[in-house]
């Protein structure tokens, strides 16, 4: 009886820890929208949201109240059940990456020996939510946006995977903990700079972040695959995108910037600081670059990123053999 009770307490502790981490990630994803709006206003020399609360700090609460009172409309011409299911799938998949990220040596929800492969597998699953949303909406703009998203995601998934093979070969492991510990004295961004460039660009494409937001380009497709969504369903897609940005940034810190390693501050503080700096860089790129044509996006991937990723893998293999 004592053993079963101890197991129950252990399971309860794991559940509460996991719930707290996921809740914090969701809140960070939501607040990232506010931070992005304020930073874009700063870059563009204008005022951002500054009316609700001190300097607009309660703008997220105002947006939440507004969204809750919006009509939860389902188009009569759509496939009702798939239409409702798609945003929930997008939200769940965006959260599935978080458990394998090692924030500190002891703060990891799910220790996976093949964490890199798990990340690649989950990031490829995002196409299903987009496909279901575009198809079930029964709208030509939504379907075109979904097709664009699928082609872009599957293409850049190839470059993303190849950019990580150099790190896997260098550290000799798919385990994220081992990869971080391998960077104790030298971060991977130094020997794997080409891989970092490919990973960063591919990560932006997988998150559909500007300038890779072709699936939802307003000038061409109005809103892309979520054109028919409103209220909380649209919010799930919206928050999922920001959670994906945080996930990609966290993996970038884990793989290239030494994870939790850093002087003076506790490990988790260093991890948060590094992740936040990369997220800020995502916002800076959105404020700086125009949106290219869709065919240019695909051309850059297959004509430039693929050779760079293969060159990085070849150089890494030569370094290991020498």
Swiss-Prot record:
Keyword Chaperone annotated: no
Protein name from the UniProt record: NADH-quinone oxidoreductase subunit H
Subunit organization: NDH-1 is composed of 13 different subunits. Subunits NuoA, H, J, K, L, M, N constitute the membrane sector of the complex.
Parts of the chain that traverse the membrane: 14-34, 81-101, 114-134, 149-169, 186-206, 237-257, 265-285, 302-322
NCBIfam families with a match to the protein in the record: PRK06076.1-1 (NF004740), PRK06076.1-2 (NF004741)
Principal subcellular localisation of the protein: membrane
Domain of life: Bacteria
The enzyme's E.C. designation: 7.1.1.-
A Pfam match: NADHdh
Function: NDH-1 shuttles electrons from NADH, via FMN and iron-sulfur (Fe-S) centers, to quinones in the respiratory chain. The immediate electron acceptor for the enzyme in this species is believed to be ubiquinone. Couples the redox reaction to proton translocation (for every two electrons transferred, four hydrogen ions are translocated across the cytoplasmic membrane), and thus conserves the redox energy in a proton gradient. This subunit may bind ubiquinone.
Signal peptide from the UniProt entry: none
The keyword Transmembrane helix belongs to this UniProt entry's keyword annotation: yes
Keywords: Cell inner membrane, Cell membrane, Membrane, NAD, Quinone, Translocase, Transmembrane, Transmembrane helix, Ubiquinone
Cited InterPro entries: NADH_UbQ_OxRdtase_su1/FPO, NADH_UbQ_OxRdtase_su1_CS
Gene Ontology CC entries for this record: plasma membrane
Reactions listed under catalytic activity: a quinone + NADH + 5 H(+)(in) = a quinol + NAD(+) + 4 H(+)(out)
Entry's family note: Belongs to the complex I subunit 1 family.
Sections of the chain in a coiled coil: none
GO BP: any one term: aerobic respiration
Subcellular locations according to the entry: Cell inner membrane
Originating organism: Blochmanniella floridana
Lineage: Bacteria, Pseudomonadati, Pseudomonadota, Gammaproteobacteria, Enterobacterales
UniProt GO molecular function: NADH dehydrogenase activity; oxidoreductase activity, acting on NAD(P)H, quinone or similar compound as acceptor; quinone binding
């Amino acid at each position: 009886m004592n053993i079963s009770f101890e197991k129950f307490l252990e399971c309860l502790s794991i559940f509460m820890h996991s719930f707290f981490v996921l809740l914090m990630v969701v809140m960070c994803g939501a607040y990232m929208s506010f931070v992005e709006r304020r930073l874009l206003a700063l870059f563009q020399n204008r005022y951002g949201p500054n009316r609700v609360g001190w300097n607009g700090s309660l703008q997220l609460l105002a947006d939440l109240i507004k969204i809750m009172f919006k009509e939860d409309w389902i188009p009569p011409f759509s496939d009702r059940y798939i239409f409702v299911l798609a945003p929930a799938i997008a939200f769940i998949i965006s959260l599935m990456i978080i458990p394998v990220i090692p924030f500190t040596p002891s703060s990891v929800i799910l220790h996976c020996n093949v964490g890199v492969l798990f990340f690649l597998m989950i990031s490829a699953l995002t196409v299903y939510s987009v496909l279901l949303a575009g198809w079930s909406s029964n709208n030509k703009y939504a379907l075109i946006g979904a097709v664009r998203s699928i082609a872009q995601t599957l293409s850049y998934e190839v470059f993303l995977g190849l950019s990580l093979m150099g790190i896997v070969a260098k550290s000799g492991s798919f385990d994220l903990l081992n990869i971080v510990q391998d960077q104790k004295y030298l971060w991977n961004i130094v020997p794997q700079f080409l891989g970092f460039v490919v990973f960063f660009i591919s990560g932006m494409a997988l998150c559909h972040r500007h300038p890779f937001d072709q699936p939802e380009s307003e000038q061409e497709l109005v809103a892309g695959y979520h054109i028919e969504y409103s209220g909380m369903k649209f919010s799930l897609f919206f928050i999922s995108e920001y959670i994906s940005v945080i996930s990609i940034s966290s993996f970038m810190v884990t793989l290239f910037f030494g994870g939790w390693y850093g002087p003076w501050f506790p490990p988790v503080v260093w991890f948060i600081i590094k992740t936040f700096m990369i997220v800020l860089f995502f916002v800076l790129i959105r404020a700086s670059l125009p949106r290219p044509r869709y065919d240019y996006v695909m051309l850059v991937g297959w004509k430039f990123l693929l050779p760079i990723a293969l060159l990085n893998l070849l150089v890494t293999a030569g370094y290991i053999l020498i």
